[in-house]
């Protein structure tokens, strides 16, 4: 099975400006993400960006870079432009790996591509990991996902879902029962689907939650979720996240 990885990266992050280039253990964050993608066994790894500073740094450490428009609302829109520019075929599998996931395990990247390859009727797959800590469940920077019995996503939110009507009133004594999952910022797409995604308007829930994947559910699409067998550390959204990742390295 062959697959490619595209890493969308922008400089003007709202919560942590310039985070793609912040130093982590002597390397810019985007390089750590790139190296994880290389280790996954991908046929090709490309960084898609609209920023010349990111392009220069990426090319300096040997990455292939595709320059894109600065008008995109999401990473999915950015990689869709890159996939067309690079001439990828409709049936090829592209993994969209966000540029703020420096701790993503390489085997998780490959597993996601394999999951999409094994499900011929699925156009989008993504990754989640069980939530084991109450603080993470109630952290608004952590995206939660609710699954159906076949591991398709029902909804994504920054809110703690599913809501425990009878248990959440006492957070100090709350015991999680394995029914809560954190969404990990990585997707696998069939290239042909990306063109379909671009034809859809952003939906109200997507705008309210600032979660691009809700556009897929709103328009009747399905996202098959792979539940990670090993812990996938959260990405970098805030200064606190950055210090946590630096401590890890």
UniProtKB/Swiss-Prot annotation:
Q: Where does it reside? A: Cytoplasm
Record Pfam families: CTP_transf_3
**Reaction it catalyzes:** 3-deoxy-alpha-D-manno-oct-2-ulosonate + CTP = CMP-3-deoxy-beta-D-manno-octulosonate + diphosphate
Q: What class of enzyme is it?
A: transferase
What GO molecular function annotations does the UniProt record carry, in alphabetical order? Answer: 3-deoxy-manno-octulosonate cytidylyltransferase activity
Q: Which Gene Ontology terms of cellular component type are present?
A: cytosol
Say yes or no: keyword Lyase present.
Answer: no
For this protein, the Enzyme Commission number is 2.7.7.38
Biological process annotations from GO? CMP-keto-3-deoxy-D-manno-octulosonic acid biosynthetic process; lipopolysaccharide biosynthetic process
Please indicate if the UniProt record lists Secreted as a keyword. no
Q: What is its main location?
A: cytoplasm
Pathway linked to the protein: Nucleotide-sugar biosynthesis; CMP-3-deoxy-D-manno-octulosonate biosynthesis; CMP-3-deoxy-D-manno-octulosonate from 3-deoxy-D-manno-octulosonate and CTP: step 1/1; Bacterial outer membrane biogenesis; lipopolysaccharide biosynthesis
Keywords associated with the record: Cytoplasm, Lipopolysaccharide biosynthesis, Nucleotidyltransferase, Transferase
User: Which family is this protein grouped under?
Assistant: Belongs to the KdsB family.
User: What is the annotated role of this protein in its UniProt record?
Assistant: Activates KDO (a required 8-carbon sugar) for incorporation into bacterial lipopolysaccharide in Gram-negative bacteria.
Name of the molecule in the record: 3-deoxy-manno-octulosonate cytidylyltransferase
Species of origin reads: Coxiella burnetii (strain RSA 493 / Nine Mile phase I)
């Amino acid at each position: 099975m062959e697959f490619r990885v595209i890493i969308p990266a922008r400089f003007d992050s709202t919560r942590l400006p310039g985070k793609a280039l912040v130093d982590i253990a002597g390397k810019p964050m985007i390089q750590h993400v790139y190296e994880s993608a290389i280790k996954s066994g991908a046929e090709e790894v490309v960084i898609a960006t609209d920023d010349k500073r990111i392009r220069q740094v990426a090319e300096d450490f040997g990455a292939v870079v595709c320059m894109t428009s600065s008008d995109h609302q999401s990473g999915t829109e950015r990689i869709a432009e890159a996939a067309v520019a690079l001439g990828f075929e409709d049936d090829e599998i592209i993994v969209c790996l966000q540029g703020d996931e420096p701790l993503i395990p390489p085997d998780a990247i490959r597993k996601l591509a394999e999951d999409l390859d094994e499900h011929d009727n699925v156009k989008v797959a993504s990754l989640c990991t069980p939530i084991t800590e109450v603080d993470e469940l109630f952290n608004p920077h952590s995206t939660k996902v609710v699954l159906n019995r076949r591991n398709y996503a029902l909804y994504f939110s920054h809110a703690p879902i599913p809501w425990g009507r009878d248990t959440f009133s006492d957070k100090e004594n709350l015991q999680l029962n394995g029914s809560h999952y954190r969404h990990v910022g990585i997707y696998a797409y069939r290239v042909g689907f990306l063109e379909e995604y671009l034809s859809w308007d952003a939906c109200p829930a997507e705008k309210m939650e600032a979660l691009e994947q809700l556009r897929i559910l709103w328009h009747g699409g399905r996202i098959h979720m792979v539940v990670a067998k090993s812990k996938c550390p959260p990405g970098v959204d805030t200064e606190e996240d950055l210090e946590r990742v630096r401590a890890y390295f």
